[in-house]
């Protein structure tokens, strides 16, 4: 069922209130529905995009200049899934080394996540050498609003309320009593047994920080809310050629044939040996004719005979030529953080300030990863790559496109000194307040976050169900 505003609701009928309708919020609501648990699903925006609604997402970035915060996320039904790229894959097992739970704890939710995303449950890998794997992503075309809108409208267990902004929570004695919301400029209270904050990788921190100011003493002052914020620098790392015939021969029967870009990722052995972070590169599936002509031209200038050989292979379609794109992990850094600014939106809630700077650790990761991959290409004669000078020189990344992977800020952990939520996504020392989404990530790996967000949301719904029936 849909409501355009928060009005005439008997909150006693809904033991769970979920705020946010992106992948985290909708997934949790759908899982609770399967267990016959009624929930309120509350969205700040409307059913469709509007510039007026997006203006509430303004914010200031201090440090590395990334995309404006109002343009790399969506305040509407379905959340930022309306503009996500669709690339889906579990995080590497080693990416969970610093988490209070492990990859195996999420494995049981993988098939459900794939069903939600309408993708195959297939994430193959093939070993190139001791340092690199060829890896496989799945591509989802799911937009959560489009896929689930009618289902939610017809649901007896999910009541969706639009145009209702969550301001903050009120609680005492380690228990959340109600949420303060603003619907059609009218302040309302939302009561429930359990509250789930699923408003995204920036808003989750913003709302908890505002709660701490509005209801002092409720949320522990020591919780590092907003800190350890991360993203995935997406960069143009260079250009390259890969001899597909030789690559297939090297991998024997283990070459991964699939539609989409050719992906290579670091193994844990490379990360440990070079003391770097995780990263992955990809080349587009279709050769970029402009790029490979430029590559051949440059090779002919310095190595004419090899250049002629390359030219022949291009025309035989034995080579994959083009730009090399890269996703690099960022190390958690408490100085990369979200705070509340002095400027407020029209409903009186402070906009955020994001302090963000890419670390030298990430710059070093890109350089050493590419150098080692280049060495592999030469040693096994499967191709050649040319690394951008800026990466060789450890210059600041030039980020491509919008910075949409917002992670950290409400990180998961075992104690309140370096984390905000526990392994079940419950806020430390508060009995009935949960946070869902990539803001809970302890580390980000190189993988797009949506798949892991969905796994964690399914797990969260399971934990709430257990508590409701205990």
Located regions from the model:
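Conserved redox-cofactor binding core of oxidoreductases
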Residues: 66, 101-176, 397-402, 411
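N-terminal Rossmann-like FAD-binding beta1-loop-alpha1 element of flavoenzymes
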Residues: 14-41
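A glycine-rich dinucleotide-binding beta-alpha-beta segment and adjacent secondary-structure elements
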Residues: 161-172, 319-328, 350-357, 361-443, ...
């Amino acid at each position: 069922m849909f409501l355009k505003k928060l009005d005439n609701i008997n909150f006693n009928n809904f033991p769970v209130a979920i705020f946010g309708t992106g992948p985290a919020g909708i997934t949790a609501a759908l899982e609770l529905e399967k267990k016959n648990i009624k929930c309120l699903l509350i969205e700040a925006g409307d059913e469709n995009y509007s510039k007026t609604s997006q203006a509430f997402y303004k914010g200031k970035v201090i440090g590395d200049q990334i995309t404006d915060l109002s343009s790399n996320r969506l305040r509407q039904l379905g959340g930022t899934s309306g503009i996500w790229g669709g690339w889906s894959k579990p995080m590497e097992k080693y990416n969970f080394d610093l988490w209070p739970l492990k990859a195996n704890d999420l494995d049981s939710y993988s098939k459900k996540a794939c069903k939600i995303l309408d993708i195959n449950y297939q994430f193959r890998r093939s070993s190139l050498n001791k340092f690199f794997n060829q890896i496989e992503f799945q591509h989802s075309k799911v937009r959560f609003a489009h896929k689930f809108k009618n289902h939610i409208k017809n649901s007896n267990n999910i009541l969706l309320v639009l145009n209702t902004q969550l301001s903050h929570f009120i609680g005492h004695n380690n228990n959340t009593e109600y949420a303060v919301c603003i619907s059609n400029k009218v302040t309302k209270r939302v009561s429930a047994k359990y509250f789930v904050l699923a408003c995204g990788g920036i808003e989750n921190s913003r709302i908890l920080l505002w709660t701490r100011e509005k209801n002092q003493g409720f949320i522990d002052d020591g919780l590092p809310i907003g800190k350890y914020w991360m993203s995935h620098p997406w960069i143009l790392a260079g250009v390259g050629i890969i001899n597909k015939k030789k690559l297939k021969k090297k991998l024997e029967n283990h070459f991964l044939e699939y539609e989409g870009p050719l992906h290579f990722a670091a193994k844990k052995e490379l990360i440990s040996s070079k003391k770097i972070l995780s990263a992955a590169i990809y080349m587009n599936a279709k050769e970029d004719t402009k790029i490979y002509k430029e590559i051949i031209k440059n090779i002919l200038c310095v190595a004419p005979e090899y250049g002629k050989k390359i030219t022949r292979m291009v025309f035989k379609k034995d080579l994959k030529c083009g730009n090399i794109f890269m996703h690099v992990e960022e190390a958690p850094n408490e100085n990369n953080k979200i705070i509340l600014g002095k400027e407020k939106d029209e409903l009186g809630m402070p906009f955020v300030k994001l302090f963000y700077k890419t670390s030298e650790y990430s710059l070093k990761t890109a350089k050493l990863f590419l150098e080692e991959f280049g060495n592999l290409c030469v040693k096994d004669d499967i191709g050649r790559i040319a690394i951008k000078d800026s990466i060789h020189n450890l210059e600041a990344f030039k980020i491509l496109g919008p910075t949409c992977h917002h992670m950290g800020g409400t990180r998961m952990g075992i104690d309140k000194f370096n984390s905000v939520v526990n392994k079940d996504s419950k806020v430390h020392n508060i009995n009935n307040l949960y946070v869902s989404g990539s803001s809970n990530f302890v580390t980000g790996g190189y993988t797009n976050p949506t798949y892991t967000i969905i796994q964690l949301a399914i797990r969260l719904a399971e934990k709430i169900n257990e508590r409701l029936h205990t």
